């Protein structure tokens, strides 16, 4: 009898937790590893070029941007 009650309670708990997480992750990507891979790929330090407004003294500007400004502190990447 006690074992049956424990099994029923466990099944109800697992069902409730599945419903809660399914509702929470509806608008998110399915696989966490894919999401983390995209975040790592888009990480600011992972790029080999400077984005708009970033300094271009130590790295080249990304395609479509030019190094403008100069001076003692170096320029910045601008369109």
Curated annotation (Swiss-Prot):
The keyword Lipid metabolism does not apply. The modification 4-hydroxyproline is found at residues 60, 63. Pfam families: Conotoxin. InterPro entries: Conotoxin (IPR004214). Expressed by the venom duct. Residues 1-22 form the signal peptide. One of its GO terms (molecular function) is toxin activity. Ion channel inhibitor that inhibits the increase in intracellular calcium upon depolarization in DRG neurons. In vivo, both intraperitoneal and intracranial injections into mice induce hyperactivity. This is Conotoxin Vi6.9.
